[in-house]
């Protein structure tokens, strides 16, 4: 089976190293990959991890049997959703679930709504509003 791993960081390299141990795996493609990953997978540096259309086209044209999407940006952009829609089984959260990592405001609002302990926070649209808030903050701002 041919696999696709989207990304080019250390996390993706570790995933590729473990996937290589499976005797069912024939070829692993890394989009875009990196110099270190090139020893363990076929890197495709001309396709960005955020070019969802190109990733899906590549996966379909190379008959990829399974994909792994790890970086935050492609997850937030819906890479898993698009691969699933194209019939490619995929490991990684869909865009809706990825919001908890890709949007700090969403994550903080979710924690507040469900009473999950988290540091105090406020959200601002302007730097002036943020500076005004800091003058009255009752906690040590970091």
Located regions from the model:
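ATP-binding N-terminal substructure of ATP-dependent carboxylate-amine bond-forming enzymes
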Residues: 1-96, 128
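Active-site nucleotide/adenylate-binding loops and adjacent lid/helix of ATP-dependent enzymes
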Residues: 4-5, 101-142
């Amino acid at each position: 089976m041919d696999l696709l791993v989207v990304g080019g960081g250390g996390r993706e390299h570790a995933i590729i190293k473990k996937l290589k141990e499976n005797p069912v795996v024939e070829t692993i493609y890394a989009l875009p990959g990196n110099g270190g990953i090139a020893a363990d997978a076929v890197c495709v540096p001309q396709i960005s991890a955020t070019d969802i259309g190109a990733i899906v086209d590549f996966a379909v044209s190379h008959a990829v049997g399974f994909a792994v999407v790890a970086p935050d940006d492609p997850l937030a952009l819906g890479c898993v959703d698009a691969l699933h829609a194209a019939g490619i089984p995929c490991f990684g959260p869909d865009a809706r679930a990825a919001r908890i990592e890709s949007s700090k405001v969403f994550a903080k609002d979710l924690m507040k709504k469900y009473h999950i302990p988290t540091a105090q926070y406020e959200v601002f649209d302007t730097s002036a509003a943020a500076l005004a808030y800091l003058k009255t903050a009752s906690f040590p701002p970091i």
